[in-house]
């Protein structure tokens, strides 16, 4: 797997109330990822970027919501969400910048 592809797989961390609780209690972090990314690619990308050991990866395809503006109806984009579980002694700190 080339490093350029691994850097593109993770788009951004997904922050919500549920994601924050999961990170604090269970060491499970949530990311928005490319729609065509596989579990193996996500695992390798997290291990490569954050220097941690990944325990497991679960993915969910999120359907975009239908939205209306006056008479025009539209749809937000579909996206993929990845739940990454780390080993007990590992942690990711998003506040540190390099």
From Swiss-Prot:
Family of the protein in this entry: Belongs to the universal ribosomal protein uL23 family.
Annotated function: One of the early assembly proteins it binds 23S rRNA. One of the proteins that surrounds the polypeptide exit tunnel on the outside of the ribosome. Forms the main docking site for trigger factor binding to the ribosome.
Stored PANTHER family: 60S RIBOSOMAL PROTEIN L23A
This protein's record includes keyword Lipid metabolism: no
Protein name per Swiss-Prot or TrEMBL: Large ribosomal subunit protein uL23
Coiled-coil segments on the chain, per record: none
Single biological process term from Gene Ontology: translation
Subunit structure: Part of the 50S ribosomal subunit. Contacts protein L29, and trigger factor when it is bound to the ribosome.
Gene designation per UniProt: rplW
Keyword Cell membrane included in the entry's annotation: no
Annotated keywords: Ribonucleoprotein, Ribosomal protein, RNA-binding, rRNA-binding
Pfam families (UniProt xref): Ribosomal_L23 (PF00276)
One Gene Ontology molecular-function label: structural constituent of ribosome
Cellular component, GO annotation: ribonucleoprotein complex; ribosome
